[in-house]
């Protein structure tokens, strides 16, 4: 995805981070955020986030969160080469939930209204979304950071 390329291209120029913003309109947003956060603890948050976006249609309607949804996310963790035992533990760790809550509160504080949303120096960018080209996205990030 475009964001991954931009993050790699800007490495050393800007600190690019991903934050969780599970929206209440998506009933499995919190478990998905937990999966991304658990993967982040093993250095693979972007990979997990991408996997979840790519496969969203297969899990967004799952109602059995304890078994079916966690099992599916565990299979994604295995595909990505994560330590699945650590992933299972981190997935339900209260610290994971607290990190997600912190990200959500931060997003609300700076005015994030949806996902994905991009922000630079605590200011959401209105003219950048997931359909923006990598080149234009990098330009907008640099411009917003005053790095032209």
For every predicted segment, state its role.
Residues 1-78, 140-144:
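Structural alpha/beta surface segment adjacent to cysteine/selenocysteine redox centers
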Residues 1-7, 74-148:
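C-terminal cap of thioredoxin/glutaredoxin-like
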């Amino acid at each position: 995805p475009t964001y991954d390329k931009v993050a790699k291209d800007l490495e050393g120029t800007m600190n690019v981070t991903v934050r969780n913003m599970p929206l209440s309109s998506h009933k499995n947003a919190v478990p998905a955020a937990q999966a991304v956060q658990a993967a982040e603890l093993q250095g693979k948050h972007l990979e997990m986030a991408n996997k979840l976006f790519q496969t969203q249609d297969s899990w967004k309607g799952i109602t059995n969160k304890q078994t079916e949804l966690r099992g599916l996310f565990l299979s994604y963790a295995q595909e990505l080469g994560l330590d699945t035992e650590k992933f299972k533990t981190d997935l339900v760790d209260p610290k994971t939930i607290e990190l997600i809550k912190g990200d959500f509160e931060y997003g609300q504080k700076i005015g994030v209204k949806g996902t994905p949303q991009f922000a630079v120096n605590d200011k959401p960018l209105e003219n950048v979304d997931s359909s923006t080209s990598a080149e234009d996205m990098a330009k907008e990030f640099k411009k917003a950071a005053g790095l032209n």
